[in-house]
Every structure is written in structure tokens, then in C-alpha cells.
Amino acid sequence: MAELVDHLAELTGFRDRELLDVTLVGALRDLLRPRAVAIYRSVGEAGQERWLTRARLSHDDLAASADPAWIDLDGLPRHEEHPHRLQAFHDQAIVLVAGDPHRAFFPVATDREQLGVMEVESEAPLDERDQRLVMSILRIYRNFQGLLDYSERDTLTGLLNRKTFDESFLKMVAQPAPA
């Protein structure tokens, strides 16, 4: 129980959404001990949606991997290439797929939008207790994303506040341009 509380405290300790995603997959990896856990975001125009890897950790990874912010969207996998992920995203429901590995797909959303899918690969199927654990942590993630949205945006215009805009701008210009 203490480990869970520690992970929740760490999860809600960041204002950076990229770190939040990395912390989320790290917490689930530590708590579930799966082969891998990843969060994928749906990006692109309607009819051309793709899956962007926000954070992925295998059981033996030291650091999470992710797609770079400036990736060419055409190089990302199309929604249709991952039908179980797409089903969880559209139905906003857990999708369980037996096999080697077993896979569980969990919808990830905020109060404003459907973001993507959390995918857990494991040796054995996730039991009900583990599924509830993931859904509960994703609810906390959703609530925290809502708090971030509220604190970062002007309620009248929906525009980023000055501090958030400055941080986002500086982060963007600090990244190397795509080759």
C-alpha cells in the first residue's frame, strides 16, 4: 500500500505532461510487473489519425522511450494498424486480448477529450484487482490533467496563461529541429 501511495504522490508532483506520462508508465510497471507498459496518444487530422508513443517501459528498461515531439506523423502507425487499441479508444472501455503476451488496453481521457490508450503486456492476463488498480490510477491521472488544464488556461479564452506559454515555448525552441 505504501508503494502505491508513493507512486501517486510522485504522479501528482509534476506539472510537465511528458514527465506525468513517464511517471504513469513507471508506476504501473512497478506495481504490476508486466513485460511492458505504454501510453499512446491519438494524433492527426480526422481520417488520418495515428498513434504517438508518449512513454513506453519494458520490464528491464532503465528509462522510458517515446516518440520525439517533432516526428513526421506519416511515420507513425495508423489507428487501423492496432485494432484492439482502437477499440479501447473508441469504446472507452477495457479491451483484453489473450496470447503471448497477454495484452490489456485501457482508455485514457481527460474531462475535455479522449487522449489515447494505455497498453499493458503481461505473462498472464490481468486479474480484476489489477484492472481496477489501473483504472483507479487512470482516474487520478484524469483528475490531475483536469487540474493542470484549469491552472494553465484562462477560463474565458481557453488560451495558455503567460507562465505556461513561456515554459512551452522555451521547451519547444530548446529541442533540436527534425533532420
Over which residues does each language-model region extend?
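Helix-loop-beta substructure at the N-terminus of cytosolic sensory domains
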Residues: 10-63
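Signal-transmission/dimerization alpha-helices at domain junctions
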Residues: 124, 133-150
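Helix-to-coil/beta transition segments that act as allosteric "coupling" elements at the rims
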Residues: 86-115, 123
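A conserved signal-transducing helical linker
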Residues: 1-22, 147-154, 172
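Acidic/proline- and glycine-rich, intrinsically disordered low-complexity segments
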Residues: 52-93
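Regulatory loop-to-helix N-cap segments in sensory/regulatory domains
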Residues: 96-99, 119-135
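Conserved nucleotide-binding and Mg2+-coordinating catalytic segments in signaling enzymes
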Residues: 149-170, 176-179
